[in-house]
Design a protein with these regions (language model features):
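N-terminal cap/lid segment of alpha/beta-hydrolase-fold proteins
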Residues: 3-44
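Short beta-to-alpha linker loops that shape the active-site pocket of alpha/beta-hydrolase fold enzymes
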Residues: 78, 83-87, 156
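Short amphipathic alpha-helix adjacent to the substrate-entry channel of hydrolases
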Residues: 64-81
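Alpha/beta-hydrolase-fold enzymes
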Residues: 115-208
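Short substrate-entry loop that stabilizes the transition state in hydrolases
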Residues: 56-63, 73, 88
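Catalytic nucleophile-loop/oxyanion-hole region of alpha/beta-hydrolase
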Residues: 71, 85-123
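Short beta-strand element of the alpha/beta-hydrolase
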Residues: 47-55
Length: 208
């Protein structure tokens, strides 16, 4: 496909749905919150482990995430998707959210995995915003990185210019889709952030 919009939109509607089995786990974080993890494990208890990072407002139900998890498990990998805060099935406890430059939760989680599975290779793959987070983490860790391998998929390296693009022409389709998802996500977070951001649900949903 040579058209970037067709390449982006078609898989959303025509890619086969992957019904991947998984188990959810809540991992408590040092600041008193939690990270929700979706585990998909093979029968081999010593299988190499791959961490999957979703994109902006994605989650375990994102088609690209499930597709990657199914493909990796088929190859014998243990797979775990790390939800960014407030992208999970339950609302996080703290007002803190996530962004493309925040690597703290990823670093904490990978260190946790390294302690839990000291002899198993650990890899990571990040999509879109998750790719931004992963790339920044790799740059921060450099030669001390505990990962054996990593892949960054479709990450908007220049976020400023990418933001400008989605404000124009067909890009507005993506802007509306992402903004609607972000507003719904923030709406369920209102009780936690009302002191920091005094906004009503009605005001929030009118943001465009």
């Amino acid at each position: 496909m040579t058209n970037r919009h067709v390449q982006t939109i078609m898989p959303r509607f025509f890619r086969p749905f992957h019904n991947t089995s998984y188990e959810l786990e809540q991992l408590d974080t040092p600041d008193g919150d939690f990270i929700e993890l979706a585990w998909s494990l093979p029968h081999n208890e010593n299988a190499p482990l791959t961490v999957v990072l979703h994109g902006l407002e994605g989650n375990i139900n994102s088609f690209y995430a499930k597709g990657m998890m199914k493909a990796l498990k088929k190859q014998g990998y243990a797979v775990v998707l790390m939800h960014f805060r407030n992208c999970s099935s339950e609302v996080n406890r703290l007002p803190r959210a996530y962004h493309s430059g925040d690597t703290a939760d990823l670093a904490f989680f990978i260190n946790h995995l390294r302690e839990q599975f000291p002899s198993r290779p650990i890899m990571a793959v990040g999509f879109s915003l998750g790719g931004n987070v992963l790339a920044k983490y790799l740059g921060e860790e450099r030669e001390n990185c505990p990962l054996s391998a990593a892949a960054v998929v479709s990450a908007p390296y220049d976020l400023s210019s990418s933001s400008d693009v989605i404000r124009k022409s067909l890009g507005k389709i993506y802007q509306k889709y992402l903004l609607d998802r972000m507003k719904k996500s923030m709406q369920r977070k209102l009780p936690q952030i009302k002191q920091q951001i005094p906004i009503t649900s009605e005001q929030l949903m009118k943001i465009d």
